[in-house]
Amino acid sequence: MPIRIDNDLPAKAALEEENVFVMDKERACTQDIRPLKIAILNLMPNKLDTELHLLRSLSNTPLHLDITFLQTESYVPTHVSESHMEKFYNYFSEIKDKRFDGLIITGAPVELKEFEEVDYWDEVVEIMEWSKTHVTSTLYICWAAQAGLYYHYGIKKHILNKKISGVYEHHPLHNKLPIIRGFDDKFYVPHSRNTGVDGEAIRKNKELTIVAESDETGPYIILNSTGSQVFVTGHPEYDVMSLHYEYVRDVKRGLNPDIPKNYYKDDDPTKKPVKSWRCHANAMYYNWLNYYVYQVTPYDLEKDK
């Protein structure tokens, strides 16, 4: 799938090195085809890594995507240059009158706070509410999945006794739903979080369906009844080294973290991690883009304004 991005975005060179089809805006403008407009609200601290992870994950269909990165106005990121944010990101206020085919809201390292205590919570709430009328389908990742379930359906998160960190076995529950087409009966997904959601509360809500889960980490993919909201509690987009960097960070902070489960060869942090979730991640993002965005979004996004 060609991804339309700014020519100077740092991720562009890395994607081209990996043989990912990237199209600059000049070439895209000469094609007689409407690209899918995808907005990404990037709340992760390392913006550049997350940009690369998500663009890589979105690159495995023949669909043409036009990516818009969003940042919050209520919080200024400290792990990326101001010039990068000014050049490649928009504020919500700049795009709120537009419509998008898809929206991705990422995780964020604020899970131990109550939602209302998060600096940018009010802004995230505004974006989540806006998405119901301006976006065909929204994909919520990790913390964002918990935030979306809480805001839209009143389902609370809870703090776990021990952090979930590693690559965990999952299984599908509803084989007829498009979101899990191509999934193996057993598949693996990275998780890295200190909080979880109440599976029973989700099951009691008639608007929600758990379509995949893990015996160890709980609900993984949750859909609303229309497919306009997809909640993913793990990190299928993670790079092979993402959990390693988090583990090393926590060791340096003196947190005495457990070794990420099912991740390092022989569970030895001195050995290279094994990426066992690539095929699943490709299938999940392909299914969301194709069946929940492309197949149902109107050709003229602005027609119903």
Descriptions of predicted regions:
Residues 1-74, 88-95, 99, 126, ...:
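Amide-donor transfer/coupling interface in amidating biosynthetic enzymes
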Residues 105-174:
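Cysteine-nucleophile active-site neighborhood
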Residues 79-80:
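Acidic/histidine-rich helix-loop elements
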